[in-house]
Amino acid sequence: MKKAIIIIGILILILLLPYVIKDRSYRSTNGPELSELKYSEIVFPNNYENIQLGGMLFLPEAKDTFPIAVIIHGSGRSRRNNKWYLSTVSHLQRNGIAVLLPDKRGCEKSEGAWIGSDFEQLATDTKSAVDYIINESNLHYSKIGLVGMSQGGWIAPIVATESSDISFIVSMSGASVTTDEQLDFEMVYNIEPYTYKFLARLIAPISVRQIRNKDYYSPIAGFDPIPYWKQIRIPVFFAFGGNDTNLPVDDCVKRLKAHNLEHFKIKTYPNGGHGILDPETYKVNQEFLNDLDDFINETNI
């Protein structure tokens, strides 16, 4: 009996050893403060779901006609002072591109609840933002496009298949695999520091099955974006960070090509993480930002 306890203790120690010796540090994104940017408050209805949405409109200086990009939020609660969003917004605004950054439903000044909403419901928030630009804003825009950030990359093609007013899509660290495949990849990364990778791969599917039943995840479980992407006939830019630990970048690129979507602009920034953040400065990668405004300004349909 004592021998069995000793053996079990040794096994536990071996399994916990990676947790003892590994150190994973976390840093917050570097970027501008909201107070440093010039914007206007807006309010617009989502008539599809009977809720009111708030947001911010960032206009470029001294430019009468301009492209306008609508940001689509990533997962979870969203706040206006999110420096990942603001870094992208600030760069676009400085380079002659207007940005409409809605408050995510249930966050800041927007009604509704993102928990329990599926992607089709969340897509109506973006469609409503586009409706606002066309019908109420009095803006002299040259074209309207979508910038889906992380989870927003799953929502963007839904909006574009239902609106003929969209001229371009940017998917920034957005997965082209299914939601469950993305979650499984992320779970392996989250579990792996506490044990060995082969065990993490065994444990991850169990965690995924549990998460599938959670209120915040069950409405989007099993979602596959490819059927939507295959309907898109406008310019698309998929941007990935090569060191992204939230989604399987190689699998995402392979899947796009496997479904004959290689005509989309697809670029991986080798040192970028999720959100295409520079690993040293923890700012959004400048090469990506330059590619972003070039893509938007050069897009013609």
What annotation goes with each model-predicted range?
Residues 26-63:
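N-terminal cap/lid segment of alpha/beta-hydrolase-fold proteins
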Residues 27, 32, 162-209:
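Hydrolase active-site cap/lid region
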Residues 78-89, 104, 250:
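The serine-hydrolase catalytic nucleophile loop
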Residues 89-109:
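Conserved alpha/beta-hydrolase
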Residues 116-137:
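Alpha/beta-hydrolase active-site loop
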Residues 232, 238-240:
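Short beta-strand/loop motif that positions the catalytic acidic residue
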Residues 234, 248-257:
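Short alpha-helix in the alpha/beta-hydrolase fold that links the catalytic acid
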Residues 272-275, 280-301:
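Catalytic active-site module of serine/aspartate enzymes centered on a nucleophile-bearing elbow/loop
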